[in-house]
């Protein structure tokens, strides 16, 4: 079931602190809508699940846009891309957004990163009573 969605604009220097989501966010999808920053700004997910593809050699390659460091996966999203994850189980975060905050100087373009989060619970799961959540 769907629970709620959240629309957010990040500005330079803002971050998403490391956390696990509340019960209404059993399954989460984070979608990068648009941005005007020049570098990738990954969302990090701590997870033992490593999504890889086998190459012809004995090495494994990670999918494009995914960076793995130990048990942390950094996912770089282009506008229109999304990532699906278990929000209640997997700690996730973003480091400080790059860039400097322009104090609305005339003619200055404000850097931003626009993201929408969609949250769900399993229909027959232990969190199903959070369907159509009204807390947000």
List PLM regions with ranges.
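A short coil-to-beta-strand element that immediately follows conserved catalytic motifs
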Residues: 1-6
């Amino acid at each position: 079931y769907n629970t709620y969605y959240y629309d957010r604009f990040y500005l330079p220097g803002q971050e998403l602190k490391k956390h696990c989501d509340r019960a209404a966010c059993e399954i989460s999808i984070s979608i990068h809508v648009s941005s005007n920053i020049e570098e990738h700004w990954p969302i990090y997910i701590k997870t033992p699940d490593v999504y890889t593809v086998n190459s012809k050699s004995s090495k494994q390659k990670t999918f494009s846009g995914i960076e793995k460091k130990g048990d942390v996966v950094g996912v770089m999203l282009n506008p229109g891309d999304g990532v699906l994850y278990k929000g209640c189980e997997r700690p996730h975060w973003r480091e400080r957004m790059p860039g400097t905050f322009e104090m609305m100087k005339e003619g200055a373009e404000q850097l931003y990163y626009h993201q929408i989060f969609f949250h769900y619970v399993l229909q027959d799961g232990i969190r199903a009573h959070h369907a159509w959540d009204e807390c947000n």
